[in-house]
Amino acid sequence: MLTFIELLIGVVVIVGVARYIIKGYSATGVLFVGGLLLLIISAIMGHKVLPSSQASTGYSATDIVEYVKILLMSRGGDLGMMIMMLCGFAAYMTHIGANDMVVKLASKPLQYINSPYLLMIAAYFVACLMSLAVSSATGLGVLLMATLFPVMVNVGISRGAAAAICASPAAIILAPTSGDVVLAAQASEMSLIDFAFKTTLPISIAAIIGMAIAHFFWQRYLDKKEHISHEMLDVSEITTTAPAFYAILPFTPIIGVLIFDGKWGPQLHIITILVICMLIASILEFIRSFNTQKVFSGLEVAYRGMADAFANVVMLLVAAGVFAQGLSTIGFIQSLISIATSFGSASIILMLVLVILTMLAAVTTGSGNAPFYAFVEMIPKLAHSSGINPAYLTIPMLQASNLGRTLSPVSGVVVAVAGMAKISPFEVVKRTSVPVLVGLVIVIVATELMVPGTAAAVTGK
């Protein structure tokens, strides 16, 4: 009975939050209210409000406010600062004319590509490769928004389509050393090499190709439906005085991430890399003009871009975090787990149930890690009691948690991309919905075809 009540409360609040965001209310305000309401109800029901890693203040009422403080410090300090730095960097690149120079140079070969959607797909594949270097979905999203997004928009790709490309690369896991993959390999009782490269990677590649094709047709359909015209920017309209080599500057963060990954050079944080990139750009500006006042005034543009990012993106991330914690403390995730364990032992049925519940949990909470970490703990027990190959259950769940995050209007990556693109999170979700669902279907079918369903098939008995 309690499980039903917790699910009902979660669903009612989720529907209410979605309704008011769709009606045009501030997403930050609506998510804050929804999250605080869930935390208050959790406290009344006797649930612990703060995560287990945090010490209570002694009172549930102050614990609620304490959690908001924790999020402000964590998301405003690390992730938030990274987002603000990326937004400030993007603003500075526009100010000094580097983005204009990229478009000016790129427009020449792009004249031979009749469809901007082909360029969009090429950008998607590049973005997917970037996920190997940047493991954070939100971090990858904001990095792509600061680098690829302006280029895509300026060469004729709609803002919605370009935002979808930046939001969706982390939906399918490629990185073999990410925490999710390591945990999934353990739950599957396989070595990391066998699990990541021999089993998961072929499925991931198939899903990425399918999602790329889906992006091509779905973004084109939505653009036609919404009467969005695609006109290549007239190069003659670009009046930038920046030298041609400035075209490399917007991509220096990506180059820095690849170089300073601990293999080719020292391992540096993305914020450190961005500081280096800003210093390089400002020094080049000084060499061009020998005008210190002009350089300092230009940097003020970057600072204002950082301030706008705090108001439009970081605070939205904090509100989304409060909402996700409210769903967690109310028992919403645990209730979904209880439902999963009540189903029978048929491998395909159990796999589909786990995929759907993991996807639902990821969509509602906005987290890819939390639902997977919660569900994956019961995989070995479920698999052994049912005679099912653990990997058969783990791989679709692993991908479903990340795919579901891309469909969540409260997930960090969707919120950050929407905020930087200045469009609604629901617009991003709409743009990613069909490609994500296509990817999910491919993952399920590929798992059924490529991964043995029974433990006996794996052991050869």
Curated annotation (Swiss-Prot):
Belongs to the DcuC/DcuD transporter (TC 2.A.61) family. Keywords: Antiport, Cell inner membrane, Cell membrane, Membrane, Transmembrane, Transmembrane helix, Transport. Responsible for the transport of C4-dicarboxylates during anaerobic growth. Catalyzes the uptake of fumarate coupled to the export of succinate. One of its GO terms (molecular function) is C4-dicarboxylate transmembrane transporter activity. It comes from Escherichia coli O6:H1 (strain CFT073 / ATCC 700928 / UPEC). The chain crosses the membrane at residues 2-22, 26-46, 79-99, 116-136, 137-157, 164-184, 199-219, 240-260, 267-287, 313-333, 343-363, 436-456. It catalyses: fumarate(in) + succinate(out) = fumarate(out) + succinate(in). It is a multi-pass membrane protein. This is Anaerobic C4-dicarboxylate transporter DcuC. InterPro entries: C4_dicarb_anaerob_car (IPR004669), C4_dicarb_anaerob_car-like (IPR018385). Coiled coil: none annotated. GO terms for cellular component: plasma membrane. It is found in: Cell inner membrane. The gene is dcuC.
